[in-house]
């Protein structure tokens, strides 16, 4: 930077003077040289002050030959810059603590939540675990899940509830504790390809129960309840058909073994117990005394017990027909006819009585011939005798009019 410098005084030639003796002598001029050094020092101090003022923060204005210039122009003119500011601008930022923690965190395992749950269940000797046991196995086996425990625990719970390959098992009596057990469905053993937990086949779906299939009950049910639970009882008074196994749900087993014992090596008595079946059993038990699963070979197979609208009709007249439940029916060899028989069962082939379908509660009463092919609906559980006539030992006078008609003692002209 060119700054105006003060003019130096011209040095005067040394004059020779003669002393008193007449000899020429030189005069010492050291005082002039000291003045020049002081001027140079003052210029250096002024220059340093100017540079310090130009480097102060904010917009500075410097006087340069009477012209006001901003600080940026002064610095861009080639002036020296502060080395401390240069170091802060181009210094590398320090590494954050979060980045260092991420570098030390273990990698996430390449397994899905279904694979992790399957690993936990299979390593257990009883092949079943609670939710807390599954989470404890995963966090102990894979360090990645130790720090994010609350987040992935919810994912484990959702996968257990939403996937059909996992079955909830209630706790057995006498084994207190918190939470239910979770196990694998027997049909989902080959869920993973070649036993590798990295590759899973298509989503497993549990087989829906067919109409003729039966759920295995942990406790034996009465005969009436078993008949009510069967959606298709088949012949009304015939022998109950054996339960048909669900196709694909259970493996083939030897005869005489319980099907629910094959679901797992340990007892799973409450695996497929349906609460809705037991909830509807008391309501259906009212009509259980109307039909008993006893063999009745002489009856037509077309007679099927209706537990719908016709069952409600039976309950209406149950009090009036209570005394008729023990009567025997006149069978072969008897030519008598029963008057005023109200049809409740479906119409067999060749019957003359017809049933209206316009939401009527009962059928049209018409006389029907008495034979073994169409027994009275209220006596479905009685055996048909081969004798010509069997009458009740009690006197018929004590019976209501309808009962006397059933016994064949009323007049033909009178209709009950």
UniProtKB/Swiss-Prot annotation:
InterPro entries from the UniProt entry: Fork_head_dom, FOX_domain-containing, TF_fork_head_CS_1, TF_fork_head_CS_2, WH-like_DNA-bd_sf, WH_DNA-bd_sf
Record has Acetylation as a keyword: no
Biased composition (Acidic residues): 30-45
GO cellular component terms attached to this protein's record: chromatin; nucleus
Residue ranges flagged as DNA-binding region: 108-202
Any one Gene Ontology BP term: regulation of transcription by RNA polymerase II
Pfam families named among the record's database cross-references: Forkhead (PF00250)
SMART domains recorded: FH
Extent of Basic and acidic residues compositional bias: 1-29
Recorded GO MF terms: DNA-binding transcription factor activity, RNA polymerase II-specific; RNA polymerase II cis-regulatory region sequence-specific DNA binding
Chain spans, region Disordered: 1-55, 70-105
Assigned keywords, A-Z: DNA-binding, Nucleus, Transcription, Transcription regulation
Subcellular location: Nucleus
Protein name: Forkhead box protein D4-like 4
Species of origin: Homo sapiens
Gene: FOXD4L4
